[in-house]
């Protein structure tokens, strides 16, 4: 299992719209759910900086994640254009081997089934 980690610095005042795009019910997450390898994601906002976010996506394997990116490139490009107006800076933190997976519950967790677990 892999964890793909992204960091975003969102433009002041754009947080709510950014959260709609990347949150557990957001368009980005809905697109990821189309892949059988997508296990879920955790979406986090920094306590010390309301414009800094992390997105951690969990995928079954790298090869299927890469196939997802290729298969949905057109939709991903459109979502990235939306994101560009909301984000000042984005950093691909990296792809990690997931040694321990969250309990898959809570307000930030989104899973493949399409429902958020509380």
Please identify what each model-predicted range represents:
Residues 94-118:
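Acidic/histidine-enriched, glycine/proline-rich intrinsically disordered or flexible terminal extensions
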Residues 11-13, 38, 92, 104, ...:
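Intrinsically disordered, low-complexity segments enriched in small/polar residues
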Residues 9-22:
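Short, surface-exposed ligand-recognition loops at beta-strand->loop->(often short) alpha-helix junctions
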Residues 34, 43-44, 112-115:
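Serine/proline-rich low-complexity intrinsically disordered segments, especially terminal tails, linkers
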Residues 23-40, 58-96, 118:
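An amphipathic, aromatic/His-enriched active-site/gating alpha helix that lines ligand/cofactor pockets
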Residues 42, 47, 90, 100-103:
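Solvent-exposed, flexible loop/coil residues
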Residues 2-9, 39-70:
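Short, well-ordered beta-strand segments in beta-rich or mixed alpha/beta enzyme
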């Amino acid at each position: 299992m892999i964890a793909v980690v992204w960091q975003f610095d969102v433009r002041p005042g754009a947080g709510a719209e950014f959260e709609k795009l990347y949150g557990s019910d957001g368009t980005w997450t809905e697109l990821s759910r189309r892949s059988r390898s997508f296990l879920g994601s955790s979406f986090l906002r920094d306590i010390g900086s309301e414009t800094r976010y992390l997105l951690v996506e969990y995928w079954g394997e790298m090869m299927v994640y890469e196939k997802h990116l290729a298969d949905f490139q057109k939709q991903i490009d459109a979502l990235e254009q939306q994101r560009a107006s909301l984000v000042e800076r984005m950093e691909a933190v990296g792809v990690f081997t997931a040694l321990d997976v969250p309990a898959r519950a809570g307000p930030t967790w989104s899973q493949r089934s399409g429902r958020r677990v509380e």
